[in-house]
């Protein structure tokens, strides 16, 4: 029994782990949770935290892996960058421009990096988020329409850049 528990515990680390990518001169991190029993390319859900949140917090609060993995969907939880007021956020322009990072470019590069390391169905890439992460899902749907298949937002509405 101990051996089985050890094997199952070890397998979860193979399919779920933190990654870093250097984008815009800074190190950016994201957590990928890939379905452990996938035999064909998986879809990808980008699940973004709200203002002041963290990728780790988004994992814990949403528990999206439990729902995504049985549907052959991987989930990535990117970490927003530090804002000018010392808390993490997504730069979507408008009144949410608390940081000067190119978050759309970061997410695009992250998608490319994940697709090069995992079997991802590039026709099934979805964006979702809470609050500031929800605003970011709208931004990605507009700015990365060549990559994002569909999106959803919780407590974040569409803002027009002026």
Task: Give the residues covered by each predicted segment.
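A general structural-boundary detector
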Residues: 3, 19, 55, 93-94
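Sec-dependent N-terminal signal peptides
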Residues: 3-16
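A domain-start/cap signature at the N-terminus of enzymes
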Residues: 14-44, 56-62, 66, 70, ...
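Generic enzyme active-site microenvironment
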Residues: 47, 77
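Active-site glycine-rich loops that stabilize anionic/oxyanionic intermediates
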Residues: 49-54
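Cap/lid segment of the alpha/beta-hydrolase catalytic domain
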Residues: 79-102
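Alpha/beta-hydrolase active-site loop
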Residues: 96-119, 139
């Amino acid at each position: 029994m101990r051996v089985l528990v050890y094997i199952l515990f070890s397998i979860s680390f193979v399919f779920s782990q933190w990654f870093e990518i250097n984008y815009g001169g800074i190190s950016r991190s994201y957590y990928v949770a890939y379905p452990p029993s996938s035999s064909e390319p998986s879809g990808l859900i980008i699940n973004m935290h709200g203002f002041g949140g963290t990728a780790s917090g988004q994992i814990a609060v949403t528990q999206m892996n439990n729902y995504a993995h049985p549907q052959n969907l991987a989930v990535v939880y990117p970490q927003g960058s530090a804002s000018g007021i010392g808390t993490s956020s997504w730069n979507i322009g408008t009144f949410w421009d608390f940081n000067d990072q190119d978050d759309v470019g970061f997410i695009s590069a992250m998608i490319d990096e994940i697709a090069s390391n995992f079997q991802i169905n590039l026709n099934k890439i979805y964006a979702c988020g809470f609050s500031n992460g929800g605003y970011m899902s709208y931004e990605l749907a507009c700015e990365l329409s060549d990559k994002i298949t569909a999106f959803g937002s919780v407590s974040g509405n569409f803002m027009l850049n002026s």
